[in-house]
Design a protein with these regions (language model features):
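Small-residue-rich midsections of specific transmembrane alpha-helices
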Residues: 1-29, 47-48, 54, 88-96, ...
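Interfacial/gating helices of multi-pass transporter permease domains
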Residues: 1-9, 37-39, 80, 138-143
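Alpha-helical transmembrane segments of multi-pass membrane transport and lipid-handling proteins
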Residues: 41-70, 129, 154-155
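Alpha-helical transmembrane segments of multi-pass membrane proteins
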Residues: 60, 64, 73-96, 113, ...
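Helix-loop interface residues and adjacent transmembrane-helix termini in multi-pass membrane transporters
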Residues: 76, 105-106, 135-136
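Membrane-interface junctions at transmembrane-helix termini in multi-pass inner-membrane proteins
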Residues: 91-115, 128-129, 139, 160-164
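Alpha-helical transmembrane segments of multi-pass membrane transporters
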Residues: 114-137, 151-157
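Interhelical loop/hinge segments that connect adjacent transmembrane helices in multipass membrane
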Residues: 138-144, 156-174
């Protein structure tokens, strides 16, 4: 229940942040006053702060929760590793939001669809690999999921930087 609730919370948060970010970018593109680079830079800075606060809160509260959860002693190490990797994957997903929003605002849905299909296929490969691998499946799944999140984030960010002039902004510096 705890994991399911957290997943639902983060899915809602990502969806809300992405919708708001794409509105800001689309509005700045529509205004055509050359402010879209500033808007994207501001969004990237805000999402970096949100990701940092998210990691800080999750890691702090996570320590408290691990003392209260009933986890078999033999699985405690794997559960802690999976938790830390999941926090990192969530933070990277938050950092991806401005790039997703930029693609949506530029109405480049073909790229969004191709990358989404590739992401689902990579996750399917993970499921097949888990049947083959003899190591701790929870730890391996966590690392492979983090790899998928990093790969997809890199694809989105590289595509946006190459395709849109407003996406080449680094944390408040235009």
């Amino acid at each position: 229940n705890l994991v399911g609730g957290l997943v639902a919370l983060f899915a809602f948060m990502n969806s809300s942040l992405s919708g708001a970010a794409s509105r800001f970018i689309a509005y700045s593109i529509g205004e055509n006053r050359g402010e879209s680079k500033n808007v994207f830079s501001s969004l990237l800075t805000i999402h970096c702060i949100v990701a940092f606060v998210l990691v800080l809160v999750c890691e702090t509260i996570g320590i408290i929760f691990f003392d209260r959860l009933v986890i078999p002693e033999t699985r405690l190490y794997a559960a802690k590793i999976a938790f830390h990797i999941s926090v990192a994957a969530t933070a990277i997903s938050v950092l991806r939001i401005p790039y997703n929003a930029s693609i949506i605002a530029h109405e480049d849905m073909k790229v969004f669809a191709y990358v989404s299909v590739a992401e689902v296929l990579m996750k399917l490969v993970i499921v097949f690999l888990l049947n083959i691998i003899v190591l701790d499946k929870l730890i391996i799944y966590s690392w492979l999921y983090l790899a998928v999140v990093v790969i997809v984030t890199l694809i989105y960010s590289i595509y946006c930087i190459r395709s849109y002039s407003d996406a080449f902004a680094l944390l408040g510096f235009v």
